[in-house]
Amino acid sequence: RWGPKEIQQLEKDLEGEIDLLWLTGELRLERPSLEAEIEWGLQFYKTSIIEALPRVFESYDDAVKSVFGNQDIDHFDLRFHSWIGGDRDGNPNVTSEKTLFALEAAKEMVRSIYSGSLTEIASQLSISNKIMPLSESNFVTLNEIIRLRSGDPESLIRRNPNETFRQALTAMNQCLDDGRYKYVNDFIVDLKTIEAGLHSIGAVNISEK
């Protein structure tokens, strides 16, 4: 929690932002294109919505556990929708091509967010097999990710020897960047495999970050 001085500084910063908004002129002097509107709408996901999701899920988990006890629970589903680029019945400028652009832009946004997260996690997850050996089954499943998802698994293994988790995450990122994940569920299964591997060595707190 923030102390009194931190709260005071945050309030001061917020007041400064409000003052700046009041003193700022019109950002657009002409009507934006539909493509610009689509990109602008997606910025809300990048800058706030996606970042807030883990806290939403954590609050949900805590609430369920407080009622039903400490048991495995499935997350509730959140599905995002946007009318920008898809309001085919109300905007004559929205053509099939514009809707396709909106879909591709959203797809690329999600891919870039996950790719950035995988890069960050892989840079930090320096667990060594020499210090904490994996069970045979977890070692096999993680290496299956490396073999299937990486374009060059041998060089990946040489670059990060004895760091199976980092290798697997990097392989997943390569697959994501290359567009080789055919189905969302394949990506989810790989993430759950990483999570199961971390749980198997007692690194539950690390898996929850």
Where are these regions (language model features)?
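Core alpha/beta catalytic barrel or barrel-like domain that forms the active/cofactor pocket
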Residues: 15, 19-31, 77-87
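Flexible loop/turn segments at secondary-structure boundaries
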Residues: 86-93, 101-103, 120-121, 132
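Extended active-site and interfacial segments that coordinate phosphate-rich ligands
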Residues: 96-120
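Secondary-structure capping and boundary motifs in well-ordered enzyme cores
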Residues: 10, 72-80, 106, 208-209
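Generic, well-ordered alpha-helical scaffold segments in large soluble proteins
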Residues: 48, 52-59, 63-66, 113, ...
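Conserved phosphate/anionic-ligand binding catalytic regions in large, soluble enzymes, centered on
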Residues: 78-98, 209
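Extended, charge-enriched "interface" segments that sit outside catalytic cores
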Residues: 1-23, 123-209
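Extended, Lys/Arg-enriched charged tracts that mediate electrostatic binding to polyanionic substrates
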Residues: 34-79
